[in-house]
Amino acid sequence: MIPKDPMILFSFINTRLRDSQLSLEELCSELDIDRVDLEEKLRAVGFEYDIALNRFC
């Protein structure tokens, strides 16, 4: 289960991306979540995924 609060979700996803060294696509698959939905939730609070950095910022 992933956090519902967008700020906690932001921190959770970035931590998992950093610690696991997975791509966003791989992490979403591992967590069984929709990548587009995740990106929309975080975009709504001002965060965009940076593929070069492999994190939301």
Where would I find each of the regions flagged by the language model?
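Short acidic, Pro/Gly- and aromatic-enriched capping/linker segments at domain boundaries
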Residues: 34-48
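N-terminal acidic leader/helix
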Residues: 1-23
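Short alpha-helical "recognition helix" segments of helix-turn-helix
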Residues: 27-28
